[in-house]
């Protein structure tokens, strides 16, 4: 039985991915900052599925938490076949001279450093086994800049570059590294970006049909099931109304 580790799985894409894979028969290690939210969706699943999910409260911004969490994973979940680096966020949307340093730091610490911390503790065992797969969740914001996106754009451009570098480093060890770069996905993303302002967040998706978290989970599952000689390097996925 294969095992997937998903970061940022309290809600949104991470939650949908965890549920998708456990229903497909995988073991799932679910990491997120909001333990009760993970516990709630886990408890809504059939008991047979619940037994194949191990949830941990982990903030990927903390290298020490990440290192400690790995040590606490039960033996039957320890061999990670697929790592999905999903944890990420945008905070604020303002010109560079009006941005908040605390927002910048949290985006850099989560979107970039968090991805590095998790990859650092998972990838060595993949190298030893000469097998494994890593899927990084990037963004269209890592392909194109937009006004007031500045630091968020920078973190996602960095994820794009890091994914390419990881693929170059790890391909010799038969490890596949992919990136999924979504456009607008209707999750808590915009509400978080606007510091809990729900009205402002709702305007982001006005007069359009955005992607859903399940759309990205389906794509992750598809990539995970390609033959071992196939590496889907990068996928840009957009709502039909976003061009």
Regions of interest found by a model, annotated:
Residues 10-11:
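Conserved glycine-rich cofactor-binding loop
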Residues 57-69, 101:
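The beta1-alpha1 cofactor-binding region of Rossmann-like NAD(H)/NADP(H)-dependent oxidoreductases
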Residues 24-40:
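Conserved glycine-rich Rossmann-like NAD(P)H-binding loop of the short-chain dehydrogenase/reductase
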Residues 179-180, 199-243:
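C-terminal helical subdomain
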Residues 139:
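Residue(s) in the substrate-gating loop at a strand-loop-helix junction
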Residues 119, 155:
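Active-site helix of classical SDR
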Residues 94-96, 103-108:
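Substrate-binding pocket helix/loop in short-chain dehydrogenase/reductase
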């Amino acid at each position: 039985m294969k095992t997937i580790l998903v970061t940022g799985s309290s809600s949104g894409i991470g939650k949908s991915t965890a549920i998708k894979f456990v229903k497909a028969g995988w073991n799932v290690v679910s990491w997120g900052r909001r333990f009760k939210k993970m516990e709630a969706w886990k408890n809504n699943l059939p008991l047979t599925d619940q037994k194949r999910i191990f949830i941990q409260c982990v903030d990927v911004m903390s290298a020490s938490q990440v290192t400690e969490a790995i040590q606490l994973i039960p033996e039957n979940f320890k061999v990670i076949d697929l790592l999905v680096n999903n944890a990420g966020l945008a905070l604020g949307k303002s010109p560079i001279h009006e941005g908040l340093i605390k927002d910048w730091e949290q985006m850099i610490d989560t979107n970039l450093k968090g991805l590095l911390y998790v990859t650092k503790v998972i990838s060595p065992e993949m190298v030893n086994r000469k097998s494994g797969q890593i899927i990084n969740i990037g963004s269209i914001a890592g392909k194109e800049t937009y006004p007031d996106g500045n630091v968020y754009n920078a973190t996602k451009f960095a994820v794009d570059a890091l994914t390419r570098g990881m693929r170059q480093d790890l391909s010799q060890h038969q490890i596949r590294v992919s990136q999924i770069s979504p456009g607008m996905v209707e999750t808590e993303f915009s509400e978080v970006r606007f510091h809990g302002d729900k009205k402002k967040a709702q305007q982001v998706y006005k007069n359009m049909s955005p992607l859903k978290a399940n759309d990205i989970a389906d794509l992750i599952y598809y990539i995970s099931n390609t033959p071992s000689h196939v590496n889907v390097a990068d996928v840009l996925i957009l709502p039909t109304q976003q061009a």
